[in-house]
Amino acid sequence: MNNTDIKLVSVVIPVYNEEASLPALLSRVTAACDQLSQNYEVILIDDGSHDGSTELIRDAAAVEGSKLVGVLLNRNYGQHAAIMAGFETAKGDLVITLDADLQNPPEEIPRLVEAAMQGYDVVGTMRRNRQDSWFRKTASKLINKSVQKATGVHMSDYGCMLRAYRRHIIDAMLCCQERSTFIPILANSFARRTIELEVGHAERAHGESKYGLMHLINLMYDLVTCMTTTPLRLLSIVGSVVAGIGFTFSILLILMRLILGADWAADGVFTLFAILFTFVGVQLLGMGLLGEYIGRMYTDVRARPRYFIHQIVRSATTPSQQEAEQ
C-alpha cells in the first residue's frame, strides 16, 4: 500500500472535564500530526463538561485555518458514545482515537498511521509499564481475561483507547444501532487484519480518572453483555450443575436420616441453611444477569439516539473541505 490510500487522518478525542490537560493535549497532538505526510483533522468531542473545556474547544476550533473541529454534545453520554459522535463527524480515511488525559502519548500517532499503511484494518495498542495504581492494573487484568473468555476476541489491553481504524471499519460501526457499545471489540468484529503495538504510558498529570470502582464494574457488564450471549449459556450450565448437586444432596440427606435417625437430621439444620443460601445466591445472580440483558433490550427497543450533537465548531476552511476541493 502507498500514501494515496490514506489522504486524510482524523484524530478523535473525547473530552470530559479536562480543562487543565487541553492546552498541552492540543500542542502535542498538533506537533505529532504535523509529522505526517497526510493531511489531518483533530476532532474534540465535549461530552457535557462542567469546567472550562467547552469554551477552550470552541475557541480553538473557531480559529481561522485551524485543523481542529469541536463537537459539543448537549450532555454527558459516556466515553464510547462520545467517540461514536466523533466517528460520525470524522472524514478521514484513517481514524485514530485518543484519550484526553495524556496518559497515552500523542507522539505515537505516526506509528499507528505507518502500521495502518501496511494493510491493517485495525491497529490496537497495549500499554507498556503502566503508571496506574495497583488496584486499577489488577482490575484491568481481570476484566481483560474475563472478556477474552466471554467474547472470544483476543486483545491484550481493552482499556487502551489509542487505536487506529480504517474508513470501512468506521462505516460498519456507524451502521450498528445498539446503545451499549464497546468500540475496540465492535471494530475487531468487522476487521480482517489486526495488529497490536506497544506504546508508552504516563501518569495522569491533571485531575482524576473518570473510571472508579463502579465505573469499572459497569464497564465489565457492558463488555460482556453487549457483545455475547456466553454468560447466559454459562448460567444454564451452572444452574444445571447446582440442580444436580442439590438433588444428589437431597438423596444423601434422606439416606442419612433413615440410617442415623432423627437426631442427626436436627443437627444438620445449619448446613441446610448454608446450602439454601448458596442456591438462593445463584438464583439472584442469574436473575440479575437476565435483568441486564432485558434492560439492554428495552433500551434498544426504545431506539433513542446514543447522543445528541448540540453544535459543531470549525474554521471556515478545514482539512476535510480542502480534500473535497482537491
Swiss-Prot record:
Instruction: List residues traversing the bilayer.
Output: 234-254, 269-289
Q: Superkingdom of this entry's organism? A: Bacteria
InterPro entries recorded for this chain?
A: ArnC_tfrase (IPR022857), Glyco_trans_2-like (IPR001173), Glycosyltransferase_2 (IPR050256), Nucleotide-diphossugar_trans (IPR029044)
From the UniProt record, list the reaction(s) this protein catalyses: UDP-4-deoxy-4-formamido-beta-L-arabinose + di-trans,octa-cis-undecaprenyl phosphate = 4-deoxy-4-formamido-alpha-L-arabinopyranosyl di-trans,octa-cis-undecaprenyl phosphate + UDP
Q: Chief localization class? A: membrane
Give the keywords, sorted. Antibiotic resistance, Cell inner membrane, Cell membrane, Glycosyltransferase, Lipid A biosynthesis, Lipid biosynthesis, Lipid metabolism, Lipopolysaccharide biosynthesis, Membrane, Transferase, Transmembrane, Transmembrane helix
> Where in or outside the cell?
Cell inner membrane
Which pathway features in its UniProt record?
Answer: Glycolipid biosynthesis; 4-amino-4-deoxy-alpha-L-arabinose undecaprenyl phosphate biosynthesis; 4-amino-4-deoxy-alpha-L-arabinose undecaprenyl phosphate from UDP-4-deoxy-4-formamido-beta-L-arabinose and undecaprenyl phosphate: step 1/2; Bacterial outer membrane biogenesis; lipopolysaccharide biosynthesis
Q: Which Pfam families match?
A: Glycos_transf_2
Name a single GO biological process: lipopolysaccharide biosynthetic process
GO CC annotations on file:
plasma membrane
Task: Kindly give the membrane topology term recorded for this protein.
Answer: Multi-pass membrane protein
**Statement: the UniProt record of this protein carries the keyword Kinase:** no
Give the record's family classification: Belongs to the glycosyltransferase 2 family.
Q: Which HAMAP family match?
A: ArnC_transfer
Listed name of the protein: Undecaprenyl-phosphate 4-deoxy-4-formamido-L-arabinose transferase
Gene behind this protein: arnC
